[in-house]
């Protein structure tokens, strides 16, 4: 059991050698003896720790649990060998703990039960009495956790507020959050074998978490690997939660206190039962609620600071969001942060509200004198180091803050109501935006329809103008097309006059081939010259030998003959080599000619292909031009039909205008005739009008006298009474009873003088105008003016034929 405890302290292969070197000498003398006796000793100590002789109780002055009167490690109950063994073990533990590079050894030691920790701590003779009693007390609490949690929960909370011993923190955290009996612990190894989609994101954030801590500092270290495994397993359990650095801060604290399986279980409990999962969701609705509650607390307890924050636009989320997300793990140093985390494991997020408000109370005077940037610097640099001496002052101030859970629930309801209203308003705004967009689209469509309906005459006129412009542009384009075609023909003629490019290429190839043959011939000539030189040398030597042949012996003569034959063979060889070279030369010429022909053939094929492509393109263009021509003909036919219709319409309009002009001319002629008649009548009226009026008055007076005379002779009972003189119109051939010479005279005088009285012709009797009869001479003169001055319409109303007038009395 001790060997497993020791080996757990050296999991990190990078630190294993250092720690081993430090403790190897001290452990070598006791290791064999420890293996034989440690199991018996530990069981004896555990039974002594769990004995009912020392019970938990509270005092009236303090709520802490009392310590027993006698330590279970008392020398009176342990043998000297046991005491020596325990002292040596504790000494080795202290050496391992003091080594900064073997931090993992503490975590390994926490894998054991609380009873073994109590036994190892109680045996230390160097610890103070108070620390020893604290260890024993926490050992009893751990062993009797179920009963203590049910019966004395307040005392446990008070002990947690005073601080959990370092060696008990792992087991106490598990007990506080009920993580020991989780079934998910058995699934941890299976989860590590699976692949998570968030692995890259986890790797990226791990390197940025606690970069100054030795346990997580080095890349791919044991700490980073443990952190990656736990976070990967949780990402497979809770796929909705997106991993963030704040999540890793809480997980780091767990991984530094306990093995990774237990850290995984504690982390799952934190996310499920301590509202951390709601804080880390993408929507962060729980964080908004915490910010609202904390801001209301500031407004209630620190109103001046709240007003200062509002005036500087210093929002609560700018400094307090990290407090709730990391439980002050990234704000304070690790010892202070773990003390706050102990209370968080016991009491939840309440400690965050208390500590945050206590910090603001203690720094209110400094914050009131700073602007927004200064306050940010103060929160980032000053506040984290205010409690380096110890967290007792901070925790004491935090529990002096008034925290009302009922009011916090009320604020939660208010926040929920506000958010619900905001969501409803947002939904209403979205609905209105959608309706507005639909209405805009409908307005646009209506405007389009309206514009299309308002084309009518303007649109037709515009189309006519565009048609005229299109005809003009078509004529211009046809002229330009003819000019371009002429230019193309000229360019083709000039191009045909130039030498063919194929001939140039062929000549260049032939030139290259000739140069190659010339170079080969020169090389062959040089070789032949060299051979001729060698043959000449051989020939000279042969002549020198044959000149003295008759003096030589027969053997030497035979040798000379053989040499002659050899020379003749060499000569024939040279001749054959010359012939071979000639054949090679001819062969090379043939190959060169073949290559030239193949190049010419390839170029001819390329030309044929290019010509075929041109033919295809020209055929396509021809089809397009034919289609354009047919379209142009169709348009021309339509235009001609329209022109004919327009011509017919113009002719009809011309005929109508001619008829209207003829009518107007006839009307003008009639008006001119009436004008002439009026002029003549006016001339007649102006001549001797005054004298005629006097004569007419005299005649009227005579006629009235005659009428009066006739009244006594005849009865005019059948006639209507006369108010004056009535002039009755009679057509020619009418019969009247009474005609006298005076009436005939008046009638004839009226016809001859054409008096200017306005005689209104009616179907009944016509009367003279009384204004002319009773008026003065000046008024008569004014009334008898010409028809153009008095009544311009009078000449038009007078009939062109004269009628006879007679007066009946």
From Swiss-Prot:
Miscellaneous: This gene is a common site of retroviral integration in T-cell lymphomas of AKXD mice.
Subunit structure: Dimeric and monomeric. Interacts with alpha- and gamma-tubulin. Interacts with FBXO5. Interacts with the chromosome passenger complex (CPC) which is at least composed of AURKB/aurora-B, BIRC5/survivin, CDCA8/borealin and INCENP.
Biased segments, Low complexity type: 51-78, 103-123
One GO CC term on file: spindle
Main location: nucleus
Biased composition (Polar residues): 799-809
Descriptive protein name: Ecotropic viral integration site 5 protein
Interaction with AURKB and INCENP as annotated region, ranges: 487-809
Source organism of this protein record: Mus musculus (Mouse)
Keywords (A to Z) from UniProt: Cell cycle, Cell division, Coiled coil, Cytoplasm, Cytoskeleton, Nucleus, Phosphoprotein, Ubl conjugation
Positions of modified residues (Phosphoserine): 102, 113, 497, 689, 776, 778
Coiled coil stretches, renumbered: 406-717
Biological process, per Gene Ontology: cell division
Top-level taxon: Eukaryota
Cell compartments where the protein resides: Nucleus; Cytoplasm, Cytoskeleton, Microtubule organizing center, Centrosome; Cytoplasm, Cytoskeleton, Spindle
Post-translational modification: Probably phosphorylated by PLK1; may be required for degradation during mitosis. Ubiquitinated. Degradation during prophase is ubiquitin-dependent.
Keyword Zinc attributed: no
């Amino acid at each position: 059991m001790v060997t497993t405890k020791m080996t757990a302290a050296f999991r990190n292969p990078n630190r294993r050698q250092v720690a081993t070197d430090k403790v190897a000498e001290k452990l070598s003398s006791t290791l064999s003896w420890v293996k034989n006796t440690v199991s018996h000793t530990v069981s004896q100590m555990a039974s002594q720790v769990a004995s009912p002789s020392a019970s938990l109780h509270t005092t009236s002055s303090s709520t802490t649990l009392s310590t027993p009167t006698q330590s279970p490690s008392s020398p009176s109950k342990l043998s000297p060998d046991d005491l020596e063994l325990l002292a040596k073990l504790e000494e080795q533990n202290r050496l391992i703990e003091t080594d900064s590079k073997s931090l993992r050894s503490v975590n390994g030691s926490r894998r054991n039960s609380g009873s073994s920790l109590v036994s190892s701590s109680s045996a230390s003779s160097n610890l103070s009495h108070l620390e020893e009693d604290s260890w024993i007390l926490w050992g009893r609490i751990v062993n009797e956790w179920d009963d203590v949690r049910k019966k004395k929960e307040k005392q446990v909370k008070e002990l947690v507020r005073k601080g959990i011993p370092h060696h008990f923190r792992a087991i106490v955290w598990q007990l506080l959050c009920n993580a020991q009996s989780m079934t998910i612990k058995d699934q941890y190894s299976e989860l590590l074998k699976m692949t998570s989609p968030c692995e890259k994101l986890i790797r990226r954030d791990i390197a940025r978490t606690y970069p100054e801590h030795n346990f997580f500092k080095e890349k791919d270290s044991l700490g980073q690997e443990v952190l990656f495994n736990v976070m990967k397993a949780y990402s497979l359990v809770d796929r909705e939660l997106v991993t963030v650095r704040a999540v890793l801060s809480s997980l780091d604290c767990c991984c530094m206190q306990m093995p990774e399986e237990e850290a995984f279980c504690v982390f799952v409990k934190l996310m499920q039962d301590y509202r951390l999962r709601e804080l880390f969701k993408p929507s962060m609705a729980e964080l908004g609620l915490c910010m609202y509650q904390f801001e209301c607390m500031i407004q209630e307890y620190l109103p001046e600071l709240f007003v200062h924050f509002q005036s500087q636009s210093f929002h609560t989320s700018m400094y307090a969001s990290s407090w709730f997300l990391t439980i002050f793990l990234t704000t304070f140093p690790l010892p202070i942060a773990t003390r706050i985390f102990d209370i968080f494991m016991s009491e939840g997020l309440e400690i965050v509200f208390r500590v945050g408000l206590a910090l603001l109370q203690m720094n209110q005077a400094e914050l009131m004198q700073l602007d927004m940037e200064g306050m940010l610097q103060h929160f980032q640099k000053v506040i984290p180091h205010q409690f380096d001496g110890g967290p007792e002052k901070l925790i004491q101030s935090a529990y002096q803050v008034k925290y009302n859970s009922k009011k916090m629930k009320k604020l939660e309801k208010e926040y929920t109501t506000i958010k619900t209203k905001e969501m409803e308003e947002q939904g209403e705004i979205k609905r209105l935006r959608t309706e507005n967009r639909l209405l805009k689209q409908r307005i646009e469509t209506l405007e389009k329809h309206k514009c299309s309906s308002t084309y009518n005459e303007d649109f037709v006129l515009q189309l006519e103008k565009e048609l005229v412009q299109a005809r003009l542009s078509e004529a211009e384009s046809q002229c330009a097309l003819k000019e371009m075609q002429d230019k193309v023909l000229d360019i083709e003629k000039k191009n045909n006059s130039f030498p063919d490019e194929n001939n140039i290429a062929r000549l260049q190839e032939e030139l290259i081939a000739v140069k190659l043959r010339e170079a080969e011939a020169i090389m062959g000539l040089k070789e032949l010259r060299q051979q001729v030189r060698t043959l000449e040398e051989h020939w000279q030597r042969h002549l020198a030998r044959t000149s003295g042949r008759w003096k030589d012996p027969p053997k030497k003569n035979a040798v000379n003959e053989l040499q002659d034959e050899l020379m003749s063979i060499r000569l024939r060889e040279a001749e054959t080599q010359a012939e071979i070279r000639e054949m090679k030369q001819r062969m090379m010429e043939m190959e060169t000619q073949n290559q030239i022909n193949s190049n010419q053939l390839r170029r001819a094929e390329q030309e044929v292909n290019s010509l075929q492509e041109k033919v295809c393109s020209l055929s396509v263009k021809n089809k397009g031009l034919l289609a354009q021509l047919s379209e142009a003909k169709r348009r021309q036919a339509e235009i001609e039909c329209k022109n004919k219709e327009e011509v017919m319409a113009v002719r009809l309009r011309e005929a109508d205008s001619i008829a209207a002009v003829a009518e107007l001319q006839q009307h003008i002629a009639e008006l001119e005739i009436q004008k002439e008649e009026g002029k003549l009548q006016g001339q007649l009226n102006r001549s001797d009008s005054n004298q005629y009026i006097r004569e007419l008055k005299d005649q009227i007076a005579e006629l009235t006298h005659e009428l009066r005379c006739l009244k006594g002779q005849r009865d005019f009972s059948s006639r209507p009474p006369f108010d004056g003189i009535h002039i009755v119109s009679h057509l020619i051939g009418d019969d009247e009873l009474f005609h006298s010479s005076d009436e005939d005279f008046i009638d004839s005088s009226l016809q001859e003088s054409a008096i200017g009285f306005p005689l209104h012709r009616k179907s009944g009797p016509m009367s003279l105008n009384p204004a002319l009869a009773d008026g003065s001479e000046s008024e008569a003169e004014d009334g008898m003016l010409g028809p153009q001055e008095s009544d311009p319409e009078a000449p038009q109303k007078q009939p062109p034929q004269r009628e006879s007038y007679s007066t009946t009395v």
